[in-house]
Amino acid sequence: MLTLGLESSCDETSCSLVQNGKILANKIASQDIHASYGGVIPELASRAHLQTFPELLTAATQSAGVSLEDIELISVANTPGLIGALSIGVNFAKGLASGLKRPLIGVNHVEAHLYAACMEAPATQFPALGLAISGAHTSLFLMPDATTFLLIGKTRDDAIGETFDKVARFLGLPYPGGQKLEELAREGDADAFAFSPARVSGYDFSFSGLKTAVLYALKGNNSSAKAPFPEVSETQKRNIAASFQKAVFMTIAQKLPDIVKTFSCESLIVGGGVANNSYFRRLLNQICSLPIYFPSSQLCSDNAAMIAGLGERLFCNRTHVSKEVIPCARYQWESACS
């Protein structure tokens, strides 16, 4: 089956062609326009998706060496995300599905991040613990199989990627700051600042306190939002970045062994943009004795290959397929703890 995947949940537009799980083309267009604003502007994101989809679709079909008529299924990210951005993708998908007379399936963007690792590791062991870490999400799932996701825990405030971007801004790094902060942290002393990992009861996470601790480290007692940041040496910036990175990832890592045991998980699947962080990958391999599956770098960021892959799998299994594909900004998962 040849499946077209479409992704537009936030600020990256993507078109991909996947055939029976094999990626033939995966085109991604990032929106640099948001950098000057220090964050994603939803209206600008929607406009960029609208302008980019047609040319990106052409590039994907040419790269894969196929025509539109060869497409057998259209899979689109329809939740969760920015409602305007999702609507652009869903409407574009509906137009194609109607014109080509092809079936259309909606795919959960967060679930697709976890499925991305399964695409590259067909022998993934289940049940698995799924960890989705990105700019907008930090969630834990029990995965009895590759297409079932039961919520175990989530962040109670900021997502981990959002926290990275905010701390990067404190350090004067340009948006998006996550990768730049990781690069800065490589040259720093992770033990220079005693940022304590947040401890939240149960299976949830919290990152707001850690963000505030970094603010105090930079501003001292004058941590008012209006107070200017004092001059900080490059050495101190590197040390703060390294100490923050260690603490923020320990916030997650310290919970995993007990959760794996409680839910009898046989593997750990990690997905999302933050899953590309090399420090976190090393940390997980140190503390977890079970198999760990990460997507390749290209499949960590928002992309349509994961949308096409999961959509194709769901369609072939005839599971979780709704008759109407509707964009939805939020999604409520069934709990694994009920």
UniProtKB/Swiss-Prot annotation:
A molecular function (GO) term: iron ion binding
GO cellular component terms, A-Z: cytoplasm
Reaction(s) catalysed by this chain's protein: L-threonylcarbamoyladenylate + adenosine(37) in tRNA = N(6)-L-threonylcarbamoyladenosine(37) in tRNA + AMP + H(+)
InterPro entries associated with the record: ATPase_NBD, Gcp-like_dom, KAE1/TsaD, Peptidase_M22_CS, TsaD
Cofactor (UniProt): Fe(2+)
SUPFAM superfamilies per the UniProt record, alphabetical: Actin-like ATPase domain
Keyword Aminoacyl-tRNA synthetase: no
GO terms of biological process kind: tRNA threonylcarbamoyladenosine modification
Cofactor stoichiometry and binding remark: Binds 1 Fe(2+) ion per subunit.
Positions that bind substrate: 132-136, 165, 178, 277
Classification via Pfam families: TsaD (PF00814)
Amino acids binding Fe cation: 109, 113, 302
Record-linked HAMAP family: TsaD (MF_01445)
General function of this protein: Required for the formation of a threonylcarbamoyl group on adenosine at position 37 (t(6)A37) in tRNAs that read codons beginning with adenine. Is involved in the transfer of the threonylcarbamoyl moiety of threonylcarbamoyl-AMP (TC-AMP) to the N6 group of A37, together with TsaE and TsaB. TsaD likely plays a direct catalytic role in this reaction.
Similarity section: Belongs to the KAE1 / TsaD family.
Protein name, per record: tRNA N6-adenosine threonylcarbamoyltransferase
Encoding gene per record: tsaD
